[in-house]
A protein has these predicted regions:
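Structural marker of alpha-solenoid helical repeat scaffolds
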Residues: 32, 66, 100-101, 134-136
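Residue-level recognition of tetratricopeptide repeat
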Residues: 36, 70, 104, 139-140
Length: 155
């Protein structure tokens, strides 16, 4: 009796049962992503903090595929763009985040920085930075620093 004759019924049963099999190079296919948009964003933050910007960007994109109005993921994606010197793209991310969440003060602050880095007129950057500063909170020192940078550029 050949090995093929013994193995064939098992292979057919596995194939018909829907159980995935491995052949050649192994590939993992995820049929259902168990992570939420927020969890993909958090994973992106972890990748970003370890310097793995490409993986972070992929996670932020996945978060946005799951929830296109996830302002936090959009701001984080803008930060990746900014880190790579793509200020125009970063600006678009921050503007979209503000459309989705008009009180996202990090987005306001980061948009002010993006406008400043692109040499844009400072009126909008100043207004954004002032609004972020007025929000108070634990990130107020960061927002004040941005406002000071905008004011310094205007002199």
């Amino acid at each position: 009796m050949s090995v093929l004759r013994l193995v064939r019924p098992v292979l057919m049963a596995v194939a018909l049962s829907g159980v995935p099999t491995l052949t050649g190079c192994a590939h993992l296919v995820v049929l259902h992503d168990p992570l939420t948009a927020s969890e993909h964003n958090d994973l992106g933050v972890a990748y970003e903090s370890s310097g793995q910007l490409d993986l972070a960007a992929k996670e932020y994109h996945q978060a946005l595929r799951l929830d296109s109005h996830q302002a936090r993921a959009r701001v984080n994606l803008g930060n990746i763009e900014a880190a790579n010197g793509r200020w125009g793209s970063a600006e678009k991310c921050y503007r979209r985040a503000l459309r989705d969440s008009s009180t996202d003060y990090d987005a306001m602050n980061d948009l002010a920085v993006a406008l400043l880095k692109q040499g844009r007129p400072l009126d909008e950057a100043r207004a954004l930075a002032e609004r972020a500063v007025a929000s108070g909170g634990e990130r107020e020192p960061v927002y004040r620093s941005t406002l000071a940078e905008v004011d310094s550029a205007g002199r």
